[in-house]
Amino acid sequence: MKLGRFLENGREQIRNLLLNASTVSSAPSFSFVSGNESADLDSCASSIVYAYCLQRKQLGRIVVPFFNIPRKELRLRPELSYLLNLASISSDDIVFLDDIVKLPKRIFSNPIYLVDHNSLDRKDLENFNGSIAGIIDHHKDEGGSLHADPRIIEECGSCCTLVCRYFMPVIRSLYDSKVSELHQTATNLAVLALGPILIDTGNLKNEKTTDTDVKIVNDLCSFVPKDWVRDEFFDTLKEKKKSCKGFSFDDLLRRDLKQYFPDGIVVNYASVGKGLDWIKKKRLGWEDELKSFAEVQNSDLVIVGLSLSKNDEFGRQLILYKRTERGAGLADSFLKLSKQNLGLEIIEEKDNGDLSMWNQRNSAASRKKVVPLLMDSVKQVASK
């Protein structure tokens, strides 16, 4: 089955289920595949590659990947739309979060496979918590779902690397097939997977890059056309990802956002690919938008991780906004515990310290590295 047809079939099955939810007493057997709630290139590509390859093994089930964001938020990710188009995928054939949350409750007993996360943080999906059947991830192991098969959690530049390594025999068999549409599907899967792997590893040049990433990229490159140029592909995708044209600061916060609920504290952690000077110059109402965002999200604490390049040097900054006393307690504990580790240096404080901006000298510490420090800070608050 062509990749596009596979996705279209899953979307049709979900649509039919939604239209007939009140009249149909039974439903087909589903398997769901979901990335994390940031819905970045890695999560979305991983979910599609995993789902298509899983379908080759689970012929009796309908395997449905879904993007863990509302459909309307796809517009905030031009790099994702661009990559989908390169892989001959129509966004109309993608299932989104707002499709899933409307499903009858009985559907959530079907198995779900997690990629690019190893627990379900989004409350909208908590009905799936007893149904986690498999995990492939490259974040810190949270220790749950020990029964999952596979349960692959290891450090790597991109989750898509681990997904492709696991399913490489399937992808290779598709490419070697004499059926032209299967051969083409292998090429489309390879292009789709190469996007996040190259973006997350800086074209295999940054500190996140592992030997596994390099090997899988070499394998995948053998499935793409000979005139495909890796550097050009990476540069175009990077430019799409960096583009902020037409986006408000609120849009930028939602573009790569994760929510955490440690000890009942609501933390929103956004990653924005711009520095503080750019934000102050280009998004004049950013402080009001940040506070409004925190209000709408009912956040106790908002963390904004900024990344910037200056004179070809990569750097990071942090913005902390403490909306509530509980958020302030967590932020203060986090700063006390992590200030030295992250190399945090204050730039500016406002609103009696509720809004603070920091340079982060430890530029290797992305959100993936900062979140475990944040969780350790929760334990400090709880023990007081």
UniProtKB/Swiss-Prot annotation:
Q: Name one GO molecular function term.
A: metal ion binding
Among the Pfam families in the record, one is DHH
Q: What does this protein do?
A: Degradation of inorganic polyphosphates.
Give me the reactions it catalyses. [phosphate](n) + H2O = [phosphate](n-1) + phosphate + H(+)
Keywords from the named record: Hydrolase, Manganese, Metal-binding
List, in alphabetical order, the GO biological process terms annotated in this UniProt record: energy reserve metabolic process; polyphosphate catabolic process
Report if keyword Metal-binding is assigned. yes
| Note accompanying the cofactor annotation | Binds 2 manganese ions per subunit.
- Assigned EC number: 3.6.1.11
Q: Which organism is it from?
A: Schizosaccharomyces pombe (strain 972 / ATCC 24843) (Fission yeast)
Locate the residues binding Mn(2+) 1: D40, D116
Any GO CC annotation of this UniProt entry: mitochondrial matrix
Binding residue positions for Mn(2+) 2: D42, D116, H138, D200
Keyword hit for Manganese:
yes
Q: Which cofactor does it need?
A: Mn(2+)
For the protein in the UniProt heading, the enzyme class is hydrolase
Family, per entry: Belongs to the PPase class C family.
Q: Which domain of life is it from?
A: Eukaryota
Name of the protein in question: Putative exopolyphosphatase
